[in-house]
Each structure stands twice: as structure tokens, then as C-alpha cells.
């Protein structure tokens, strides 16, 4: 193992990278509440892993979506556990996100020069809520169907462009297969990609600027 490590060390300077990561100064006022953001990130990773596992069995069609979820829960080995973990970690992510934003706001972490860190955090909050809205519809049961119908109907109140936005979200005039396909694509590809990008930006800015001082 030593020779393998030395081979990589000679080419990538792994030790220098590790030293830079572990030697970052942590202010003495930092407490457990400053770790809440890390819990949000951990919940996101659990979401990605458990969601990826379910894509092997889930079928995003109005005829088979509900039965495929039933199959995951009853026939797939540990499928019930994987889906439950996905649901529990989703709730944990939302709860910890709210607490994290409260902590940042109450400790003034949004002030100069960290305004952009706050902005990326707000964008991540919007993406998290979008995860909830799109994921809620995927079982395509009565609750999911009517939730989608109500949510996608909200923009209709916007003058001039409201109807066009509704059709864009639904993939047509009414809720159906095109709507489910759109929500599935958003939930499994678009939103995870955007979340990963903005999380990286968020972390890099925190790394660059450090943790905000006490009030």
C-alpha cells in the first residue's frame, strides 16, 4: 500500500491537499449549530443514493407508476427500507435546511462579504422545495395527482402568460403522461444537477471566506 500511495503522492501531491483541507482555521465561537448545514448535505447524499436505487424499478408512466412503487415496497429486497429512508431523509433535509437558514440569519452570516453565499443558499432552498413538489407526484396516486394539478394550476392567475406557464409545466392543457414525464425528469436529473452545482459554489465560497464571526 505504501508504494501505491507514494505513486499517487508523487503525481498528485495528495498530502498537500489533505493538509490544506484539515488545517483550515475554525473560530472558537463555532458550536454544534454550525454543523446543521453539513446534515443538509448528508441528507442530500442519502437522497441521491436511495433515489438512484429506486430508479432501477420505478416506471414513470401513468399506467405503471403506482404499481411500480407497490412493487418496490412489497417485492424488492429491502425496497421498503430504501423508499422509507428516501422519505425520511427528505423530511430531515427540509427540517435541517430551515434550521440552517435560521442559524445563518440570526448570526449575521448573510452580511458583507458573504452576500453571494446567502444567495446560493436561498437558491438551494428553492431547489429543495422543488424536489418535494416533483417527488410527491411520482407515485401517481390520488394525493400525488391532485397535488400536481393544484401546484401546476397556480401560475394560471398570472396575467397574460399564466396559461402558457401552466401548459409548459403540464406538457399540455391537462395533467397526464407529459406532466409525469416532466416531473420525473426534473426530480431525477435537472434538480440534482442544479443542486450539486450550487452546493459546490456554496462550499467554495465558505471555504474562501471562512465562517462568519460572532455577533
UniProtKB/Swiss-Prot annotation:
Positions of heme b 2 binding: 86, 187
Parts of the chain that traverse the membrane: 32-52, 90-110, 116-136, 186-206
Binding-site residues for heme c, renumbered to this chain: 35
Source species, domain of life: Eukaryota
GO terms for MF: electron transporter, transferring electrons within cytochrome b6/f complex of photosystem II activity; metal ion binding; oxidoreductase activity
Keywords for the protein's UniProt record, in alphabetical order: Chloroplast, Electron transport, Heme, Iron, Membrane, Metal-binding, Photosynthesis, Plastid, Thylakoid, Transmembrane, Transmembrane helix, Transport
SUPFAM superfamilies documented for this protein: Transmembrane di-heme cytochromes
Cofactor: heme b; heme c
Disulfide bridge partners, by residue number: none
Membrane-related topology note: Multi-pass membrane protein
GO-annotated cellular components: chloroplast thylakoid membrane
GO terms (BP aspect): photosynthesis; respiratory electron transport chain
Cited Gene3D superfamilies: Cytochrome Bc1 Complex, Chain C (1.20.810.10)
Cofactor remark: Binds 2 heme b groups non-covalently with two histidine residues as axial ligands.
Localization: Plastid, Chloroplast thylakoid membrane
Binding locations of heme b 1: 100, 202
Function recorded in the entry: Component of the cytochrome b6-f complex, which mediates electron transfer between photosystem II (PSII) and photosystem I (PSI), cyclic electron flow around PSI, and state transitions.
Oligomeric and partner information: The 4 large subunits of the cytochrome b6-f complex are cytochrome b6, subunit IV (17 kDa polypeptide, PetD), cytochrome f and the Rieske protein, while the 4 small subunits are PetG, PetL, PetM and PetN. The complex functions as a dimer.
Family the entry assigns: Belongs to the cytochrome b family. PetB subfamily.
Note, other: Heme 1 (or BH or b566) is high-potential and absorbs at about 566 nm, and heme 2 (or BL or b562) is low-potential and absorbs at about 562 nm.
Protein name as catalogued: Cytochrome b6
Amino acid at each position: 500500500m505504501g508504494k501505491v500511495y507514494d505513486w499517487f503522492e508523487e503525481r498528485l501531491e495528495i498530502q498537500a491537499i489533505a493538509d490544506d483541507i484539515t488545517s483550515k482555521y475554525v473560530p472558537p465561537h463555532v458550536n454544534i449549530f454550525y454543523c446543521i448545514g453539513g446534515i443538509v448535505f448528508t441528507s442530500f447524499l442519502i437522497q441521491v443514493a436511495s433515489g438512484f436505487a429506486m430508479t432501477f424499478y420505478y416506471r414513470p408512466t401513468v399506467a405503471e407508476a403506482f404499481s411500480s412503487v407497490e412493487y418496490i415496497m412489497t417485492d424488492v429486497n429491502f425496497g421498503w427500507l430504501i423508499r422509507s429512508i428516501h422519505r425520511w431523509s427528505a423530511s430531515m433535509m427540509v427540517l435541517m435546511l430551515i434550521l440552517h437558514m435560521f442559524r445563518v440569519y440570526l448570526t449575521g452570516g448573510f452580511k458583507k462579504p458573504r452576500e453571494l453565499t446567502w444567495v446560493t443558499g436561498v437558491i438551494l432552498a428553492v431547489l429543495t422545495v422543488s424536489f418535494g413538489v416533483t417527488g410527491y407526484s411520482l407515485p401517481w396516486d390520488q394525493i400525488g395527482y391532485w397535488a400536481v394539478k393544484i401546484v401546476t394550476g397556480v401560475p394560471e392567475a398570472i396575467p397574460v402568460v399564466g396559461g402558457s406557464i401552466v401548459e409548459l409545466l403540464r406538457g399540455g392543457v391537462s395533467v397526464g403522461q407529459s406532466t409525469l414525464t416532466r416531473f420525473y425528469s426534473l426530480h431525477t436529473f435537472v434538480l440534482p444537477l442544479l443542486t450539486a452545482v450550487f452546493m459546490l459554489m456554496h462550499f467554495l465560497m465558505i471555504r474562501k471566506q471562512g465562517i462568519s464571526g460572532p455577533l
